[in-house]
Amino acid sequence: MRVIFSISLLFTLLFSQVRVGEMKSITSSLDVQTLIGSGDDIILATRGGLAFYNINSGEYQVFTKDDGLSDTDLNTLLKGPKGYIWVGSDAGVQIWDINQKKLVDWFELDIEKVAEFVSYDDVVYGAIEQDGIWGIMEFIHTNDRIYYRDFYGRNDIGEIDDIVKFGDQLILSTDRGLLAGNPHETHPLYWTNPFPEIQTSIIALDQRNDELAIVTPDAIYSVKLGGNPVSLVTNEIEFNTIHTIAVAGPQDYTAVSDSVIYHIGNDKFEKQFSDAGYHFSSIFHYSSNILLGTSLGFALFDGTTFNHIAWGEPTVNSPDIIYLGQDKSMILASQKGISILKEQNWINASTVNYTLGLSTQIDLDYLNLNMGSRVSEIVENSDGSIYLGMQKSSSGGILLLDIKASIEIRDVFISPRLLQDKSGQYPLFTVNAMTFDKNGNLWVLSTNQEGKPLSVHYEDYSRNFSFEESGNLLSESMTAITKDNFNRVWVGAKSQLVMYKYTGDVYSPTDEIWVSEEINTGAFNSSVLCLNVSLNNRLWILTPAGLIYKDLQVSETNPVNQTGPKMTNSEIYPYFSNVAFDESSRIRFDPRGNIWITSQNGVHIVSENGEYWPDVNGLNESNSSILSDDVKDVAFDRDEGLAYIATNKGVSVIKIPFAEKKKTYNSVNIFPSPFRIPSSKPMTVDGLKDNSSIKIMTLSGEVLRTIPNSEVQGYQAYWDGRDQSGELVGTGVYLVAIYDNNGASSFEKMAVIRQ
């Protein structure tokens, strides 16, 4: 089958005509949680959105927040009444119109988890956790609308794994065993076990055509409607590994564990397929095939042949870090591996070894190492070499990567450059932070050598700094590092900053200076979470109390000129003092020097003179279409004015008014063309120099509208199709005169169609 929908091509088009403030999503739909077959379509609930795959054409489409979804990290789905697709996630219940390709409704309702849906007489029930209570939630259709009716919770249930309709009853698989009842007759509080002979825990459950399959630790049962459970197979140790079962026919079942497909019948328990790499999540009988959701796409299995289907997306969907390289390659990294967007294609390296029948649509290599619990930092040397720091890795502290053609490991920094800790036979290496100085030396904060948290590296040279060498200013609590514009190294600890300055060769210096500086937040907890220095040589310090700065000066013994921000009474008053920051929060600078701070409550932006963008709340799920409030990192395309915001659910890309200053008008782009009016969205003139103004003119030179530079947002100006008096202009071709305060100018033509 051929995928004719090009995700790479779509990515290149996403941001070609985007206005400041507009946001697009980059997600990965490879991690499939649930899937069903419907006609020629396979419908998938994934960690990156709602996906549709046409079995005949190979066309693949993914719907995200860009298309109206409220959440993209999806758990389960159902094709319910009127053909609507019911989608469950930890953020609520969404209903999708498959024909109009749009969201019909969304119910948040303090939902914390959706386990499964079932349809019962045109009523949809969900096994749902709400405010810490598990129960079933009821939705009804009336007058072509969907309504939430009620939630029936049970305090005696710790979890519901599944819900199925069997005859006129709904059966729940819970941590208390099976519970069943008719929702039209009995309140769920009074539901009881429909099969008292089954008193053990329930592993998996499914029903089809009046046949019920039940998996317990001791047996797999078949139940005919109106009958009693009949054990098909018993006492197989692998029962406990099964998590999903699907009924194909009478006493004919298929079950999956994390890596094995089983065929089950009367006195039959056969292993049909096994591969530890795929991580099966769900199963669905579709025509003569079995559909299998996996952590890397999905598969069709006919009992013999395993046909894997995946597409060109990143395998890293929840990155710890994002980095845009010198060649504009975008790097995503996490404990699962590395994904790189290079020349419109994703290349991937995974710590999971996928061995059998991998789809040729995905570029994936095996990364034979342990990447620990978190990727702490990515830095790039002047030659394009990529250094990736890891925390709690058994393989090493730093990966040196070559990504020119593929993802190749050139080196792994371990002992003696980053010495082992004291964890015994299986030491873990932890690098908390890294930075390059102006001489190309790589500075590293690591916990791997007792009494020597700071080290420096250049090719085969290395040096570890001890507590004693620093005058006992260094400590094991050092977690943040940066360099200033005077090539001095700054490290942060729980209660202080330490500056180090060397003269000559750092590996055998002629002089060294160590200076301690108080943090001065005025708060009880002033530990340093992150450090970064702006182009203006302002040292920005993130603490649990908020964001402060220190203006640096050339003096080696007194390197700080002043600390801020300050209130009118001269006391320090940190920015974002009401935001919860932690050790995963980062400080990044956009092309205009604005400070972006990541958190689990969105990303917060402030300029060096204290102005917030877009306001004091920053960007979060309540005021934007960002994929998640849990923001891990930010990177910037300096030329295009794009901020790539890495979240735990993918990357949100927003057009910001903070691109590099344009030197000419050669990159001016006017869109849409033609401009059809009236329109809810204005015509946009993109690629302007600073302090530009616009005049809309007829071909004969009559000025219809002037847009002064005070109304220009960064490098974009907007026109609503109206003249100076507020009237819509007529159909025709118009001139756009662009000019700045220094006399530079440009003329463009654009067409208007008045409808």
For the regions a protein language model found, what residue spans apply to each?
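Short, glycine-anchored, charge-dense loop/turn motifs used at functional sites
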Residues: 693-704, 734
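Short, surface-exposed loop/turn motifs with a glycine/proline- and acidic-biased composition
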Residues: 65, 709-742
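Extracytoplasmic/periplasmic beta-strand context in beta-sandwich domains
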Residues: 176, 218, 668, 681-683, ...
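A generic structural motif
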Residues: 353, 710-711, 751
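C-terminal tail/sorting-segment detector
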Residues: 735-755
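Bacterial Sec-dependent N-terminal signal peptides
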Residues: 1-22, 743
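Glycine-centered coil/turn sites that cap beta-strands in beta-rich domains
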Residues: 663-696, 709, 716-719, 744
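Carboxylate-rich, polar loop motifs that coordinate divalent cations or form catalytic acidic clusters
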Residues: 3, 17-667, 703, 735-737
